[in-house]
Every structure is written in C-alpha cells, then in structure tokens.
A protein has these predicted regions:
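Hydrolase active-site cap/lid region
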Residues: 103, 135-178
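The feature captures the conserved acid-bearing segment of alpha/beta-hydrolase catalytic domains
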Residues: 169-217, 221
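Alpha/beta-hydrolase active-site loop
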Residues: 96-117
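Glycine-rich nucleophile elbow surrounding the catalytic serine of serine-hydrolase chemistry
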Residues: 126-136
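C-terminal catalytic histidine-bearing segment of alpha/beta-hydrolase fold enzymes
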Residues: 63, 71, 214-262
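Alpha/beta-hydrolase fold nucleophile elbow
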Residues: 117-128
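N-terminal cap/lid segment of alpha/beta-hydrolase-fold proteins
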Residues: 27-51
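Short substrate-entry loop that stabilizes the transition state in hydrolases
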Residues: 54-55, 63-98
Length: 262
C-alpha cells in the first residue's frame, strides 16, 4: 500500500512539473497548472492557484452523466482558483447518487487534494446529483468542511422522475435496493444542521428536472427550522441555465464563509 501511494505521488509530481513548464506565463502565474491522479480506480484532479499559500481547498462534485473534468476547465470554478483556492474533483464512481462508496471517494480525495495543494479542505461545491453526493459526504464523512455551496442541487431522490435515467441509476447505486433514508439529504436536514456548516443554495423555480419546491425550497426550510446558517439565491431559467453560475457569488461565499477575504 505504501509503495502504491509513493508511486502515485511520484507520478502526480511529474505531471505537475510538466504542466508548470507548459503553462507558466511571463508574470510567473500558473493559470492552468493541474495535477491528475488515480485513487483506487477513480480519476482525480486538482487545479492549483497562482500562490504558494492557498486560501483553502474546494472539492467539486459533478452531476449525473458528468465526470471529474466537469466545470473544471471553465471560468466559474477558475474564478475560485484565481482567487487563491485549490479546486479538486473526482469521478466519484460516476452515477453514485451519494452512496457510501462516494463518501469513501470523498475522504480519499480530501487527503490527496490537501497533499497536492498545500491547503485545508474548507468547501464542498455540489452540482445537481453532486448536491446529494456532497451533502451525504458532509453527514457521513469522517471529516467535514465548514462551507457548502450547491447549484441546482438534487437533494430529494424521490422527486427525480423527470431526470432521464435517474431512477435506474439511483437503484444501481444502492445495489438494487431502496435508498436508505439517511442517504436522502432532505431527510437528514437535522444532521446537516448539526455539522455546523454554512450552506448556500442556488436554484431556479423553472428547473424542469430538479423540482425547486421539493428540493432546494424544502431543505432550506428544514435547515432554517433546525437552526442552520443557510441562504438561498433564486435564479431563473432551466436546469443548466448560465444564471446559476455566478463566479462573484461563489467566490464571495467561499471567502466570507471561510474567513479568507482579502
């Protein structure tokens, strides 16, 4: 096991060095520096900020049908990186719908991302299905970040009938058995509130796939009831409408929540 970890570390270091050589600009900033790796069969990556003293590590959780590259090369998450954050992602066993193995994947990524980035994990970011994956990691994981940010988050698996293939993927994720109630975030609002995390939801009432009222609307109401620090930003447009992806809102929340504002 130790030999395997050393080998992974050497491979990651070589990749990082090569990417630095390829991407360092005249200013010395590394706008596209990445480290990629493989943790027990799951591809992972981190995007590194242009500083040796990062503000923290943010872990991004992809949605159904996506992978560890989702949003990682776009301007939304890159705004966080340019502000001084390490941004990490994983395959998380693809269509995991927050099952136990995805929580194990999160803990492995946590350790690896901190090692590669030189900062502490402070923020989870969940998109669509990634809302369930990240919130379940928050409840069931050995370690918990102080901050959580969800975009169009799916948090009630019983309401995913309009998401193509979701019912089949959810069944497969839980071995053909009904998902446990303690893996359905809307039903774990009390436990989520007790983590002490600060929550930010971004969702649209016009989302045709993830119903607003029974997902973001309902869980925000329950979190408020249980005394959590939670806010909701309502946007317009369908499920992946650009209005969801405000770089300013993401960066401002991350820094305010983590206490890392300049």
């Amino acid at each position: 096991m130790r030999t395997k970890r050393i080998a992974q570390g050497v491979t990651a270091t070589v990749l990082a060095f090569l990417l630095v050589l390829l991407t360092t600009g005249a200013s010395g900033e590394h706008p596209a520096e990445q480290v990629r790796g493989n943790l027990d069969g799951q591809r992972v990556r981190v995007n590194l900020p242009p500083t040796t003293e990062p503000k923290g590590v943010a872990i991004f959780f992809h949605g159904q049908g996506s992978n560890y590259n989702h949003k990682m090369d776009g301007t939304w998450l890159d705004a966080l990186r340019r502000d001084g954050w390490v941004v990490a992602s994983s395959m998380f066993h693809r269509e995991n719908w927050g099952n136990p193995i995805s929580t194990e994947d999160t803990m492995k990524l946590w350790d690896w991302a901190e090692q590669q980035g030189g900062g502490e994990v402070k923020l989870y970011i969940g998109a669509s299905m990634g809302g369930t994956t990240s919130l379940n990691a928050l409840v069931h994981g050995e370690r918990k970040p102080a901050c959580w940010y969800g975009v169009k988050p799916a948090v009630d698996m019983s309401t995913m009938g309009n998401v193509p293939g979701a019912r089949r993927f959810i069944s497969q994720a839980y071995g053909g058995q009904p998902y446990p109630r303690d893996r359905n975030p809307v039903d774990t609002a009390f436990k989520l509130a007790k983590t002490g995390a600060t929550f930010r939801f971004v969702a649209s009432p016009r989302d045709p796939f993830v119903p607003y009222e029974s997902n973001s609307g309902e869980i925000v109401s329950r979190l408020n009831q249980f005394g959590a620090d939670v806010s909701l930003r309502t946007v317009q447009g369908p499920h992946d409408d650009p209005s969801h992806y405000s770089a300013h809102d993401l960066v401002a929340f991350a820094n305010e929540c983590a206490g890392t504002s300049d």
